[in-house]
Amino acid sequence: MENIIHVNINPLITGFGNWAVSWHGFFSFVAVLFAVVLVGRWAEDYNLDQDIVYHVAVWGIIGGVIGARIVHVIDYWWFYQNQPLEMFMLWKGGIGVWGGVLGGFAGGVLCAHINKYPKYVLTDLAAPALMFGMVIGRIGDIINGEHCAKVYEGIFAMSWDHAASDVSNCKMKGAGIGIPVQPAIIYEMIWNMLSLYIIWYFRFKLYPSGMLWVLFLLLYSIGRLIISYLRYDKIWVPLNFFGMDISITEAQVIAIICILITLPILIIKVNFKNFSSFQFIENSSKTRAEKRRQNKNK
């Protein structure tokens, strides 16, 4: 039992009646903020005006929030069907990452399409920033204990001990307050960090534009498909392979679809390029503001 990681932190930072701010919500906000700041700073590396990037980011955030909440509500419909008002209480936490990714993608691409912005370049710009944001967001998941992982007492098992922890919603699945479970959220955070390293390594090495985003989707899908087997989520497709339960959840269904789409795209379309002697932005002593004004006058 000495190998168990105990989390005994109140999942709510503050609250007033039905209004509450959770650590999950706080770190989700910080993650989005960092992602927006990063894409703004990296914009000039892609010869993009920061105003364009921020314009698309607003649409992406709106689409991401809507998509994330919809996917979460669908996955936990057994809870929300009896408490429908809880669907709109975003400040309490509760999002589906897949919904955030795909909803944000849809919102951003729609904005780029309407305004004739280079959408594939913008998706490549967003890929590492979004993965970085996911790493930050997982800190809130670790504190809140939102994910129902499978009961486990081995090395690095996790136990949420605070009475208000969201893990209390996992009682019907054998988990609950003070019960050691798989550190699935830690594994996912580590996978996201590794994926961030891979994405950053291939930044400016893959073309045509859009391939870095495809790589992002593939990496996240692989991690989510595998790690979800350590969690208890609603089963969408019951499967049994020679007596072994390999039933598939909502997140895994989406992950499999993404893998089936992104892997062939990377195999067929991606090309590698050595940029060691190539510069997207020539060296200059000009400030960012001066560069933006110069680009606007072109």
Language-model features and meaning:
Residues M1-K298:
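A feature for loop-to-transmembrane-helix boundaries and adjacent hydrophobic helices
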